[in-house]
């Protein structure tokens, strides 16, 4: 079994602030449901621009989000925009239009809907390429 400890550096960030990364440093950024956290639309635009900043030309921003087809969408306490709180946890849900509104500087390659888990959760896998 390979030990990857020497190859992986784990750091904690407040993603609402500038990332401690050089410009055009990465070929790709992947996040699973990060954009679904309790982030405002402006926070999401700012995060997207930070990802744009750290990606190399033609780099990819690949992410998953819960979408409006999810069974929990519009359940719980509405917290503004497309955010709903259930059991003390806020989830930001995405329409295809909201995904496309985050394309500043990117070209969308694909938006693929899929199910996750036994509920199941309804997610979208988004692949965007930096222009």
Residue ranges and their predicted role:
Residues 16-29:
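A short acidic, Gly/Pro-enriched loop at the edge of an enzyme's catalytic core
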Residues 27-42:
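A short SAM/SAH-binding and catalytic strip from SAM-dependent methyltransferases
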Residues 25, 58-59:
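Surface-exposed loop/turn positions
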Residues 39, 56, 104:
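Short conserved AdoMet
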Residues 1-18, 46, 60-131:
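Class I (Rossmann-like) S-adenosyl-L-methionine-dependent methyltransferase catalytic domain
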Residues 45-57:
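A short glycine-rich, Lys/Arg-flanked "PGG" loop and its adjoining helix->strand segment in the class I
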């Amino acid at each position: 079994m390979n030990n990857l400890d020497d190859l992986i550096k784990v750091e904690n960030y407040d993603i609402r602030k500038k990332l401690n990364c050089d410009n055009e440093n990465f070929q790709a950024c992947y996040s699973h449901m990060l954009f679904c956290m309790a982030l405002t639309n402006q926070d999401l635009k700012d995060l997207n621009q930070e990802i744009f900043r750290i990606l190399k030309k033609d780099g990819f921003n690949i992410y998953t989000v819960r979408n409006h087809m999810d069974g929990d969408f519009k359940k719980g306490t509405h917290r503004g925009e497309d955010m709903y709180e259930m059991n003390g946890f806020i989830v930001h849900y995405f329409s295809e239009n909201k995904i496309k509104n985050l394309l500043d500087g990117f070209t969308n390659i694909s938006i693929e809907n899929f199910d996750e888990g036994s509920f199941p959760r309804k997610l979208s896998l988004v692949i965007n390429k930096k222009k």
